[in-house]
Structures are given as C-alpha cells and as structure tokens.
Amino acid sequence: MAEDGRKMSKRRGNVVNPDDVIAEYGADVFRTYEMFMGPFDQAISWNTQGMKGVKKFIDKIIALFDKVDENYQDEAKILTILHQTIKKLTQEIDEFKFNTSIA
C-alpha cells in the first residue's frame, strides 16, 4: 500500500522505487523496514518516516559493536542467550512472523 493508503500503482504514480530507497537509506535498512512492516500476510501502508526510524535502529545496533568488551569472561552465559535467541528466531521465521522476529 502507498503512504496515502491506496494500492500502489504505476498508473497512479504512487509506487515506491526500491532503488531510490536503497540509494538513500541502504539495503540493510530497506530489508529491515520490510520485515518490521507487520505480518507477512497483511497489506500495510508504506511509511517513509518508518524508514528513518529503522535507520536509527540499525545505527544503534552498529554502535553497540563498538562497546563490546573483548575481555568479557562469561562465555557460557552469552552462548545460552545466543542459543535461546536462535531457537526463537527460527520458530518465528518458520511461521513467517518476520516483524516479531526482529523486534
């Protein structure tokens, strides 16, 4: 759906060109925004402001890597959390719940 709530159509001229969006925000932001949009089986309106929010989200995640302490010793705890996360993500992706799997 277009930002105005109508179905996207070349005839109406309300189609979002993915190449333009990727040029402005990047492919990772574009893909993540599409996953955040909502349940896979529902029509959701495009929202350019949402792209800006996802860009901030991605930037925060990238900034977290700068704060990683390479001397952290509790590897077992990290591995437990990692395996729990992988299990949850796998289940949600299998159920096409992309929007909740990345949230």
Where are the regions a protein language model picked out?
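Long, charged, mostly alpha-helical binding arms that flank functional sites
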Residues: 1-103
